[in-house]
Amino acid sequence: MYVSPTMTGEGAAFVYNGYNEWCNPYELSITLNGELKTTDHQVVTSLNVAEKIDLEGDGKICPEINQFTSDTFKATNGDVLPYASFTPEKDDKKNALVVWLHGAGEGGTNPEIAYLGNKVTSLISDEFQSNFQGAYVLVPQCPEGYGWPVDKDGNYTSGATPSKWRESLFELIDNYVTSRPDIDANRIIIGGCSNGGNMVYDMVLSHMGYFAAAFPMCHEFDINTVTDEQLNYLKTFPVWSTYTLGDSSSYKGSIPIVEKMKEIGATNFHYSQFDNASDVTGRFFGDPSDPTILDTTGTSKIPLQYDGHWAWTLF
């Protein structure tokens, strides 16, 4: 059935109530009324769709669910963090670890949301895994509130004050590493989108020397909050930042950092800047007069344009 991420009423698996949740119960009533085409524009003549489906946790929407393991971690301060993880095939060698920090929409107590909300499953794809010859993937989930960049008083922070989750999150990551001897402690890479991108910088700069590289996206971390020591550390620390010019967050976080890294002559800072967040799958196209509207004619070759904040779709 031809649908797109921008359409409404098409039976989305998630509902958004401040953050994403499984649509449960998931019930559909679908009838064929007029011409319907598949994604390759073949005409559908009949439908046979179950009216009630239990989507949660069984791989119906995304078979990769079955490759992740979910658990919880209790930190020494009492924080309980849900997380999901992927284990590569045993190969008698050290493996890298990739840590993903979700955005505001994927918090809660079901880590499936944290790795499905932004297609983090791409990190376990053959294409991505081949770059590391197999890598562990760890997806922590912030269990409450607005998400990772919140200080001890419950206020949003872009770096001026430390995240209340800083130490419990680091403890989870470090415990995961030390309990798996085949993880290469010299190849721990951390990335994340939106407020997860804020937290990437919080973690890197509060535990300098621990992470090997970082890949933040579409964040609002304020480079003006860092110390001279931290700024000097970033001068050589490997970072690849991704953002769009169509995202207001870019002008608070990503772009000022790019400018500062150029100013100080950073030697290992890289970035991908896009005009907007357009579809890269080749499946969805926009109306020629307005690419933010889905083209249903099958004739447009202009990629569908998403919200400018969705830089993770370009990763």
Regions found by a protein language model. Name each.
Residues 1-97, 258-259, 269:
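A domain-start/cap signature at the N-terminus of enzymes
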Residues 89, 93, 151-194:
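Gly/Ser-rich "nucleophile elbow"/oxyanion-hole loop immediately N-terminal to the catalytic nucleophile
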Residues 97, 104-167:
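Active-site machinery of serine-nucleophile hydrolases
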Residues 101-103, 218, 243:
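The conserved beta1-alpha1 loop
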Residues 108-114, 148-153, 202-203, 226-227, ...:
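Short, solvent-exposed loop/turn and secondary-structure capping segments
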Residues 133-135, 233-239:
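Short, proline-enriched alpha-helix->beta-strand connector loops that line the catalytic pocket
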Residues 178-179, 185-233:
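Primarily recognizes the serine-hydrolase "nucleophile elbow" in alpha/beta-hydrolase
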Residues 240-258, 262-315:
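C-terminal catalytic histidine-bearing segment of alpha/beta-hydrolase fold enzymes
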